[in-house]
Amino acid sequence: MGTWKNKNSNKKNRVSYISVPAQIINSVSSSSLHKFLDNKSSKKNTSKFFFNLRNPKLWAFSLFLLSILGISLRLGLCLSHFGSGDHESQLQSSDSNGSPKSHMGFAYIRSSTTQVEISNAKDRSLDMGVEKNETFGGHQSHLIIPNGNGHDDKNYDFWKQPDGLGYKPCLDFSIEYRRESKKILVERRKYLMVVVSGGLNQQKIQIVDAVVIARILGAVLVVPILQINLIWGDESEFSDIFDLEQFKSVLANDVKIVSLLPASKVMTRPSEDGSMPFNASPQWIRSHYPKRFNREGVLLLRRLDSRLSKDLPSDLQKLRCKVAFEALKFSPRVMEMGTKLAERMRSKGPYIALHLRMEKDVWVRTGCLSGLSSKYDEIVNIERIKRPELLTAKSSMTSNERKLAGLCPLNAKEVTRLLRALGAPRDARIYWAGGEPLGGKEALKPLTSEFPHLYNKYDIALPLELKPFAKRASIMAAIDYIVCKESDVFMASHGGNMGHAIQGHRAYEGHKKIITPNKRHMLPYFVNSSLTETEFEKMIKKLHRQSLGQPELRISKAGRDVTKYPVPECMCNQSNTTI
């Protein structure tokens, strides 16, 4: 605040105070300010001129100063607003549902309770080993992004997507198929019920085949019944996991689907059959099942897992793809949760997804050993002796023979060496799906040591976010499926139904990169101590040159599943490039 003394011969000395905004004071140098306030050497007549309230020049000058002050303040406010708006635009965006997001990428409502959750999430991210500037949802990538591709020159080859050779989805059914559809869709005499069992991806395979069988029989399909999983106690119904309306509407021109039997047939006991052989053909189904429908026209099938032949006529192969990739979508709430986690993983650039098969029962079933220590080998061997029925085929082979034959899952150490050899950057963000590994955190130590940014769904979910799905193993698996499918690079340590399903889905959506470990040929190099690291990496890259998700013809080998290899039945070549 500045102070002026005004002398008047008729009045006592008075002190006048003028408030000056801090912005103006700060913008004036101290020397100038000192002169402006305390310069007593100014001429008295000048001082009298300024403080004569009756002088019109004073009013004009005052208005001029006020105008300058107003412009300065307005300009300052505009600049302040622009700066804060730009900052907020970086810290806050909207998710797919229109909800605001914090700078961590988590959807939230502006309430004190939720702000506490966000704060807790920040603390959790630090506990997980995430650096302060690497909270989930940040908009600045930790990777250099030339041309918007999410990688620098050094890591370009690893993140580079395979050449899809112009293949795109095309489900053009034949004239004969469409003609038959008109007859089938008016059918009301035969109803097919199916009970599907196993884990999520086993259920999906059976649902796909159930639709195809209903089409072959010309029957109405009742929405499949999901058998309660005795191991996990999952009581989810079809509509809990999958989008029922999507399922019905997409297949409306292929198979008539109803949620329940008609009232006239509800009380009837369906004819039940579980004798379908492996590799059953459409001819076998047409000759065997029509006579199995009961008097009311209801047939119940069980144990469909991998029974229907993988080699079907082209139209039925297209129908398989239509069910697997277009009709069988996850329910809205499952999709929302999975998509949200995928967005958090991608918030700082591209990410890798791994499906790790390191659970105790996997080592027992495969006849392999984890490679952790003799302690864990003994645990697996004891369990295998107790339950010999769990061991899969080729039980005469030793665990070492199985490993060298490429029949064993990769352990964390092998996964780490493979990723490093293929050029995965150390700062790559990795999402891993799968059950609790035998050995817990110790089993994952080789991975976390080399790739510190390793997360699963529990690491990146907000507190209580996964609680509604806590006892729903199939829904948890569906969330993993979504995050893995949306990744930039995917790899399964041991094939399996989920790995195969994701491989086919990623191919159908544009041949996104998948690493298929060439276990049988690469493991000898893993134990060859005479190789330098450079030589090792060169050999591993050479082995996997054609195993990175490029289009591959299903018909090149008999018995391949079209939902894993959708070319050529379900995808057309738009560029006339041959495989």
UniProtKB/Swiss-Prot annotation:
Q: In which pathway does it act?
A: Glycan metabolism
The residue ranges crossing the membrane are 58-78
Residues carrying sugar: N133, N528, N573, N576
One GO process term, biological-process aspect = fucose metabolic process
The record's keywords, sorted A to Z, are: Carbohydrate metabolism, Fucose metabolism, Glycoprotein, Glycosyltransferase, Membrane, Signal-anchor, Transferase, Transmembrane, Transmembrane helix
Q: What is its EC number?
A: 2.4.1.-
What InterPro entries does this protein map onto?
Answer: FucosylTrfase_pln, GDP-Fuc_O-FucTrfase
Q: Which family does it belong to?
A: Belongs to the glycosyltransferase GT106 family.
- What is the protein name stated in its UniProt record? O-fucosyltransferase 24
Which organism is this entry from? Arabidopsis thaliana (Mouse-ear cress)
